[in-house]
Curated annotation (Swiss-Prot):
Disulfide bonds: none annotated. This is Peptide chain release factor 1. Methylated by PrmC. Methylation increases the termination efficiency of RF1. The gene is prfA. PROSITE patterns: RF_PROK_I. The keyword Protein biosynthesis applies. Gene3D superfamilies: 3.30.160.20, 3.30.70.1660, 6.10.140.1950. One of its GO terms (cellular component) is cytoplasm.
Length: 372
């Protein structure tokens, strides 16, 4: 059974959820667009926890009712209760674990939109083709979730592939869903250009960065060097007669970003600044994560982009996520954006890991207090 401490935390969340629900009916909130959106967003973030808590309560009540029926004299009622309990009792542990996961402290960046970068790695043209397929996979997944997507920059490759592409994705808690996609994605298959039928291995790097706002990252204009040039299309030919493309260099870090998707230089500059802030924000988040890891003296998997995270084996129609030992089949569906189960598995795995870390930290703090 859940401890009283856990139940109190869950009940506090439920109380806050009810307060927010009441606020949405308040005319002063409904007439204030910004506040209405803020309240709605917070309520939506709490709703899964509240629904799970209420389902758990019903489960516990149903078990209690059926256990009471075991004391009845009627043998049919007792048999029915046994059958019900055989179905209900196995649901308790998974339900309790799920509720505990909801109490894991949230990543402060989880609510943010993201900038997604996909880069072809080892494998030549085949890597470029797979990079294009991963782009389509993420765009289709975003479409399924109702997110908005905008391609910010693309470098075309051969045979319809891409060397690298940057996409802005906006919607509800995008980073919380996509953050574990960062890393090296490996593909194993027979390329269309392979005459001997040999299986080739290629790699593509995916980076998912939370989009930073001005309040998150302050960038001094003195630290920015801007170059303008003419936009180029596939093969390098100029597609614009004006210098509308923008390249920004952040002098303190050496980070370079470019944007040439828009015809307006101002729009390209604004887009490039969003990309730059996201990269700087990611560096700061990684610095904070490293500091926490060093303090705990433990390494928690974070989907680091240098980590080989996943293999797409086409001859065997199999996807394997190496971090969590997860396997599924039907790659055509995966490449069409049907990746929710993979993402859910990653979220559950890392949430459980974070919960264990938090529990160890709380235990250590308690021991220190007792010694004091």
């Amino acid at each position: 059974m859940l401890s009283q401490e856990v139940l109190k935390k869950l009940e506090a969340i439920e109380q806050r959820f009810e307060e927010l629900t009441a606020l949405l009916s308040d005319p002063s909130v409904a007439s204030n667009g910004d506040r209405f959106r803020k309240v709605s967003k917070e309520r939506a973030s709490l709703e899964p926890t509240v629904e799970a808590l209420r389902a758990y309560r019903k489960l516990v009540t149903d078990i209690g009712d059926n256990e009471a029926l075991l004391e009845e004299k009627d043998p049919d009622l007792r048999e029915m209760a046994k059958e019900e309990l055989a179905q209900l009792r196995p649901q308790v542990d998974p339900a309790e674990e799920q509720l505990k996961l909801y109490l894991v402290p949230k990543d402060p960046a989880d609510e943010k939109d993201v900038i997604l970068e996909i880069r072809a790695g080892a494998g030549g043209d085949e890597a470029g083709l797979f990079a294009a397929e991963l782009l389509r996979m993420y765009l289709r997944y975003a479409e399924r979730r109702g997110w908005r997507t905008e391609v910010a920059d693309t470098s075309a490759g051969n045979l319809g592939g891409v060397k690298d592409v940057t996409v802005n994705i906006a919607g509800d808690s995008v980073y919380s869903w996509l953050k574990f996609e960062s890393g090296v994605h490996r593909v194993q298959r027979v390329p269309a250009t392979e005459a001997q039928g040999r299986i080739h291995t290629s790699t593509v790097t995916v980076a998912v960065m939370p989009e930073a706002e001005d309040i998150d990252i302050q960038v001094s204009p003195a630290d920015i060097e801007m170059d303008v040039f003419r936009s180029t299309g596939s093969g390098g030919q100029s597609v614009n007669t004006t210098d509308s493309a923008v390249r920004l260099t952040h002098k303190p870090t050496g980070i370079i970003v470019k944007c040439q998707q828009e015809k307006s230089q101002l729009k390209n500059r604004n887009m490039a600044m969003r990309m730059l802030r996201a990269k700087l924000y990611e560096i700061e988040l990684e610095r904070q994560r490293s500091a926490r890891d060093a303090a705990r003296k433990s390494q928690v998997g974070t989907g680091d982009r240098s980590e080989k995270i996943r293999t797409y084996n086409f001859p065997q129609d199999r996807l394997t996520d190496h971090r969590i030992n997860y396997t599924r089949h039907n790659l055509p569906a995966v490449m069409d954006g049907d990746v929710q189960d993979v993402i859910d598995a990653c979220r559950t795995f890392y949430a459980a890991q974070a919960l264990r870390e938090a529990s160890r930290g709380n235990a250590a703090d308690g021991a220190a207090e007792r010694r004091a």
